[in-house]
């Protein structure tokens, strides 16, 4: 199913696609939400269609979200778009035979950044308040973050021009300014377990490696999949070249991690119940 409107305005920027295995038309399935990349200024959900289809074949209901792009809006408006989609998903998930108790989310590049911050906002009210965003939370158990554009204000080609378009010209004077740093404890400690993916040829590899160190400093549950030097394995290769053997490995490993987190969460709930 494609181009389902998740907002009342019926804008092309407020639509989502749904993928499910052909051999499981009505079976309740675990859910993966996907947010496409493009540096928050480019891209569309169609770029990720083969990635989503391949993930769906592993037995998931995959929901791919479109959202507005900078400079037509600010980063905070993009967060509002994602939360509007979350609200629609929560209200309609049973219609699509999705299991809300087994829900995960993935994003690549700018989409990984957007996903990270939206999940932080829904789990940490201080971040949402500083952004002046109203979350519509979903019980996301784990994140898959591929070649994440986590940092937006470094002294590099991204940080030199993008922040004013993302956050507004005077963002450094706002309450949100401390949260532009994704290593802020309010961000890190609000996230569910994370599966990080990068590669030696990923031009944003240093972003993932720095973010991984921040997770490690806070003893946050995570896994890093870092591929060695290979000319084929560039930025977000598992999304743009989803049929590579390494892409298959990435998608399968991410799925395995999600299932591992789900099992450990369920086991913990059973142990808690038994202790009462």
Language model features with spans:
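Alpha/beta-hydrolase superfamily serine-hydrolase fold, recognizing
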Residues: 1-276
């Amino acid at each position: 199913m494609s181009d389902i409107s998740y907002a009342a305005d019926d804008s092309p920027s407020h639509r989502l696609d749904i993928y499910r295995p052909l051999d499981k038309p009505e079976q309740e399935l675990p859910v993966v939400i996907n947010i496409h990349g493009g540096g928050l200024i480019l891209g569309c959900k169609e770029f990720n269609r083969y990635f989503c289809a391949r993930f769906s074949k592993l037995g998931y209901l995959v929901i791919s979200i479109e959202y507005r792009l900078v400079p037509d809006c600010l980063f905070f408006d993009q967060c509002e778009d994602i939360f509007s989609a979350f609200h629609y998903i929560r209200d309609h998930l049973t219609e699509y035979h999705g299991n809300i108790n087994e829900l995960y989310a993935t994003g690549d590049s700018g989409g990984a950044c957007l996903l990270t911050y939206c999940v932080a906002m829904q789990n940490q009210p201080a971040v949402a308040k500083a952004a002046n965003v109203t979350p519509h939370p979903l019980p996301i158990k784990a994140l898959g973050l591929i070649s994440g554009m986590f940092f937006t204000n470094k002294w590099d080609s991204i940080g030199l021009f993008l922040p004013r378009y993302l956050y507004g010209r005077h963002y450094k004077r706002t309450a949100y300014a401390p949260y532009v740093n994704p290593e802020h404890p309010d961000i890190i400690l609000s996230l569910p377990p994370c599966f990080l993916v990068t590669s030696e040829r990923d031009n944003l590899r240093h972003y993932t490696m720095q973010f991984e160190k921040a997770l490690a400093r806070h003893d946050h549950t995570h896994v890093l999949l870092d591929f060695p030097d290979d000319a084929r394995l560039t930025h977000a290769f598992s999304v743009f070249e989803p049929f590579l053997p390494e892409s298959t490995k990435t998608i399968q490993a991410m799925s395995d991690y999600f299932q591992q987190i789900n099992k450990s969460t369920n086991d913990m709930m059973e142990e808690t119940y038994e202790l009462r």
